[in-house]
Structures are given as C-alpha cells and as structure tokens.
Amino acid sequence: MGMTMTQKILADHAGLDKVSPGQLIKAKLDMVLGNDITTPVAVKEFRKIGVNKVFDVNKIAIVPDHFTPNKDIKSAEQVKFIREFAREMGIVNFFEVGQMGVEHALLPEKGLVVPGDVVIGADSHTCTYGALGAFSTGIGSTDMAAGMATGEAWFKVPEAMKFVLKGKPGKWVSGKDIILHIIGMIGVDGALYRSMEFTGDGVAHLSMDDRFAMANMAIEAGAKNGIFEVDEKTIEYVKEHSTRQYKVYKADEDAEYVATYEIDLSQVKPTVAFPHLPSNTRTIDNVGNIKIDQVVIGSCTNGRIEDLRVAAEVLKGRKVHKDVRCIIIPATQKIWKQAMNEGLFDIFIDAGAAVSTPTCGPCLGGHMGILAKGERAVATTNRNFVGRMGHPESEIYLASPAVAAASAVLGRIGSPDEL
C-alpha cells in the first residue's frame, strides 16, 4: 500500500523509505513551539537534560500570547522567565509584546512554517499549520524540552481519514462552519490519533484563512493532525510570507484510509456548537431563541483578516445590542494594523464593540472578557468546555465570525440574513 501526505512527511523526516500506521519512529523537527504557559515547564525540563544550548536557535519559536500583555504578577513572572531563557540561548524567534500575536496565526505570517515541515508545539492547536501542507501536532512541555535539546521527537505514525470536499460553500459559510459540521458528524473522538486529510475540488473554494480554521480544530475531533493538499493558493501564500525552500508531499493513489467522507460544501449551513462540546452542533436555522451576554471574535481559529472583514460587513451601519458586550481581537499585530488601515476599527467602534490588542485572552478564560455565572457567549474560538471562558456555570456557543457578529446585533444567536 502507498502512503498518505502525513505518512510521507514523517517517513522523510525519519530517514525511512516507508512508514506504516502504528509504527514508532524518531523524526527530525523543523520547528519547536511554546507559549507563556507551556514554555516555563519546558525550560525546567530542558535544564535537567544537561545540555547548555538548543539544537538550532532559528528552529524554536516562543510566543507569549495566552496572558499577554501580562495580566497579573504571576503571568509577568512567567514571561520574564522565558524571556531570560530565550536571551540566554540566543533564540531568534522570541516574540515580545509589540511583535507577538496569537501563536498559530503568527508563525505562518512570519514564514516560519512551510509545506512539508514537521512541527511540534506545546499547545494542542499546533495542528493549525496543516493548512500549509505541513505535519504539525501538539505535544507536552516535556517533549518540547527534548525537541529543543535534540531537534528530534518520537511519533507513532497515525492512521488516516480522508475528507473529500466537493462543491462551493454558500454565502456566510466559512471554514469554521465546515469543520464544525464535520466534528458534529464524527464526534470529538471521531478522529482519535488519526490524521484528517483534506482533499477534493472543493478545497479550491476555501481561502487560506478557511483552511487555517479547519486544520486548527482537527484536534477537537481528537485528531493527531489535520492536513490540506498543497495547491496554488498555498504556494502563493508561502511565496508571500517565506523565503524558505520546501517540498510538497502528495498522497499515493493507493494510500490507505480507515474512513473516507465526501462533504458537499454547497449543502453545509452556518453551524453553531452548543455547550459543552464542539460536536454538539446545530445549523443556524435550528438554534432557537438563545439570548446572549457576550460575543468574542478572534483567536487562533478566527482572528485573521478575512474573519474581521466578514464581521465588519455584518456590523457596518448597525449597533451591538444594548445587552451584549462585543469584543474583537485581531490575532496578530500585522492583522491589527491591516484592519485599522482598512477602516474596520471605525466600523467596530461605531457599532459599540471593543477592540483589543492581540492576545488569546478570553478564549481560555485568561483575561479580556471572562464570563460570570449564568452568562452566555458566542465565540469564534475552538473550545466550549465547562468553565473554558470563565465561571463553570457559564455557556459558550462556537460559531463563525458572521454568525457571531450577527448575534451581537440581535442579542441572541442568529444569522446575518436576519438583519
């Protein structure tokens, strides 16, 4: 049997001609990533290894983004600790306040990940870079420490699931709706330790921002990684953001998949994930009358420029409902500046929304929009577990920027078509 995209990348980085699902391998790493929560633990473990330098100062990225700008003394101490480590080791890609952004939006923008890479990150949504045709996956801080020291990591080669995307999505349907539709279909463990491989002629109708959102949420189906075939849009994106050489891996015709799904994108509707699982989905025409207290538009899933443009399209000339707080968080400084230059901030502020500096912030219940007991939020983030954004008795509804913006105006979960 042949190999999938993921299996080919892993085989090449392990120096092997072929790998099979379940095989344990040791592969070379192109990037090791950590943030302000996971890196302090990794640094402590790194010290225990007994080495005095990292394997490559250019192949490590440290992004303080979760509690940044520092929300309290403890978070300030954490960032100080990893800042000093980055300086000591000469790590090139340490992104301070003013340069930093939400890590999984920042690394592709900076050209640090290209097709065919193997990337590990001490953050579960590291799978985002599969949008570029890379193998990327989340790991723990101990593996980050070992990766920084050796430039290698061990993997169990995953089985694969194939998602053949067909047709063209309709108005207001984005990558977020498509991945919520898929997770609703297969469940939060439907792709457990498998690679989700996205292909088909429908991929051409998805922007890179759509693909980043979909790969980002592969972990919400339990996947080891999500990965898209490289096409002209990918190549154009990489050309614009990176000067690195790269290799494109295509699946063999006889590659083996444990399951294959065909998704007609024209039939996918705007979709909302109800509490408390990303798989608890309903289409927008079946949500009922759910009043809300807060809307958050941002995160590593939906804080990119296209997301903000869609939100602005919905909010333009309208007002956020008097009972709703609307918080908009561009994912990086570059996106923030672009949104400002395009006049999107005027639209947001005139509508009554607040615009934040780039940060993960409320997504993980960190800061910049914590929920109180009994409050409901519509968020363009990726997780709606109990207590994820604040009080354990609050509720989170996951949606696209279009639905989130419309809900901010309506005061309840709803569609832009209702405005």
UniProtKB/Swiss-Prot annotation:
Which catalytic reaction applies to this protein? (2R,3S)-3-isopropylmalate = (2S)-2-isopropylmalate
Question: Which GO annotations describe the biological process of this protein?
Answer: L-leucine biosynthetic process
Q: How is the cofactor bound?
A: Binds 1 [4Fe-4S] cluster per subunit.
Q: What is its EC number?
A: 4.2.1.33
Q: Which cofactor does it need?
A: [4Fe-4S] cluster
Q: What class of enzyme is it?
A: lyase
Q: Does the keyword Secreted apply?
A: no
Query: Is this entry keyworded Protein transport?
Result: no
A Pfam family this protein belongs to? Aconitase
Gene Ontology molecular functions: 3-isopropylmalate dehydratase activity; 4 iron, 4 sulfur cluster binding; metal ion binding
N-terminal signal peptide: none
The pathway is: Amino-acid biosynthesis; L-leucine biosynthesis; L-leucine from 3-methyl-2-oxobutanoate: step 2/4
Q: Which UniProt keywords apply?
A: 4Fe-4S, Amino-acid biosynthesis, Branched-chain amino acid biosynthesis, Iron, Iron-sulfur, Leucine biosynthesis, Lyase, Metal-binding
Record-annotated residues binding [4Fe-4S] cluster?
300, 360, 363
UniProt-listed InterPro entries: Acnase/IPM_dHydase_lsu_aba_1/3, Acoase/IPM_deHydtase_lsu_aba, Aconitase_4Fe-4S_BS, Aconitase_4Fe-4S_dom, HAcnase/IPMdehydase_lsu_prok, Homoacnase/IPMdehydase_lsu, IPM_dehydratase_rel_enz, IPMI_cat
General function of this protein: Catalyzes the isomerization between 2-isopropylmalate and 3-isopropylmalate, via the formation of 2-isopropylmaleate.
Question: What is annotated about its quaternary structure and interactions?
Answer: Heterodimer of LeuC and LeuD.
Name the protein family. Belongs to the aconitase/IPM isomerase family. LeuC type 2 subfamily.
Q: Which NCBIfam families does the UniProt record give?
A: hacA_fam, IPMI_arch, LEU2, PRK00402.1
From the Swiss-Prot or TrEMBL record, give the protein name: 3-isopropylmalate dehydratase large subunit
Identify the species of origin: Acetivibrio thermocellus (strain ATCC 27405 / DSM 1237 / JCM 9322 / NBRC 103400 / NCIMB 10682 / NRRL B-4536 / VPI 7372) (Clostridium thermocellum)
Q: What is the lineage of its organism?
A: Bacteria, Bacillati, Bacillota, Clostridia, Eubacteriales
Query: What gene codes for this chain?
Result: leuC
